[in-house]
């Protein structure tokens, strides 16, 4: 009977939670705490996280309200805390990238698998029309202690926002 079938679960890969900004925005190093403050609405202006910034309001855009990316942020990054008022949703990850490309004050949140330039078979080149944010677990983010969601940094633990991807397999003959 089907009720006696027990699925097997296997980790098959990793995906990073990536933060992206407009290509004209050079503010690309943030701490985990900076990003949490942005996501919860405690930091709503660029000057709240980048002293002296004149960029204005921060708009945060996700792929959609019920996506795995959104759920991961609520559960694993914000630990159940509510999103701020500056959060909005597109319908797809491509729309997030397009929105960030067209809106200089925005931050997009997508899976890192959407970032790679498909023309680069080594997967070490990110899309040219956006900047990928580097994230630090330290109290102050610098280029030396902040990491982009490259596969190597997802695997070795330097990049802090990593999701494990699983395959669930059911063998009806077991």
Regions found by a protein language model. Give the residues of each.
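Exported/periplasmic ABC-transporter solute-binding proteins
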Residues: 1-174
């Amino acid at each position: 009977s089907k009720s006696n079938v027990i699925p097997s679960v296997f980790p098959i890969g990793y995906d990073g939670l990536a933060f992206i900004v407009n290509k004209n925005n050079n503010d690309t190093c943030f701490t985990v705490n900076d990003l949490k403050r942005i996501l919860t609405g405690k930091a709503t202006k660029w000057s709240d996280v980048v002293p002296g910034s004149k960029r204005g309001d921060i708009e945060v855009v996700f792929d959609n309200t019920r996506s795995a990316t959104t759920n991961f942020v609520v559960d694993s990054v914000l630990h159940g805390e509510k999103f701020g008022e500056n959060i909005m949703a597109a319908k797809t990850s491509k729309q997030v990238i397009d929105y960030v490309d067209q809106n200089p004050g925005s931050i997009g949140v997508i899976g890192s698998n959407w970032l790679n330039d498909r023309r680069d078979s080594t997967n070490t080149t990110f899309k040219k029309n956006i900047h990928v944010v580097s994230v630090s677990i330290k109290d102050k983010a610098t280029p030396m202690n902040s990491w982009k969601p490259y596969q190597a940094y997802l695997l070795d633990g330097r990049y802090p926002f990593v999701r494990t991807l699983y395959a669930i397999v059911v063998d009806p003959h077991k």
